[in-house]
Amino acid sequence: MFLIIPLHRGGFRWRPRWGIRGYGLGAAARITVWTFTALVIAQFAGIIMKKMLSHVRLVHPEVSSSISAYDNAFLIFMLPQSFITTSILTALFPRMSRANADGSNSAMKKLLRQGLEMPALAIIPCSLAMVVLARPGVQTVFSLEPGQVGSLARAVAVMGVGLLPFGIATLQQRYCFAREDGKLNLIMQAVTTGVQLIILVTMFVFPPQHALVVVAAAQTIANLVGAVAWLVVASRQLGGIGMGEVNRLWTKLAVASIVAAVPTYLVAHGIDAAGHGAWVGHAGGTLIGGVLFVALFLVLAKILRIVEVLDLLNPMLRKMMRRS
């Protein structure tokens, strides 16, 4: 109220503006419709998948391919995705939106490369660790009957292979939202869901005890196809992303992870077997195997000169040296 007189004397005249044009509500409404439609498609695929698992369980009650088994496998799968990929991409999203607002393709390219590289430093090793530690790991976390272990462990392993494609799918969503391109997000979701449903149909071709593995494979392959399709589209939109550098980093990380996974598998499963089914054996195999995998991976990262891993590791080592 105190500012009314000074503003009037300064020449300010308030004129009410009627209507809702010019506020960006139209663009917001359009992207909301596209996004909601994509969400409906994704949820539809989830409902179909769970209906199919329920049918298998109903017809073959002796198998362990239940919805609860899928939920348990997905819970383990989502841990690294939630802590690593989602955290990094959430931090990148405001900068991606700013790059789009500024019309800077070069900034967007740089941010996309960061989104493809930074999570991969931990996600690719986590993928291989999930594969080799799946069996003792699920027995450590869940109370399972002997007949339930194999199916759940295989599902976790297959899902683990798809950690990177799932992360790329998350980056694709952030990219589309930053560009206010809900239509592209819907198209990518339709592609992913279509591939997933096609693979899910094969559930009735394989023996019923493999139903859960088929669901895991459908998720992994669908996300892989969707990730590749989006990378092609984004590369065309931005005039290239620089995937050569990204692929070289992924290859080095995969080599280091695979080499570290072999002795880890032998040690972890050896300790697990020595426990004769006791929880201590499962937990010991998982814990010691996990520590061994991390140690071997870091040594191999140094040998292969994976600079990005060393850049993350060196500050932590310096802090530890100072404290000691």
Predicted regions mapped to residue ranges:
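Membrane-embedded alpha-helical bundles of multi-pass transporters/translocases
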Residues: M1-S324
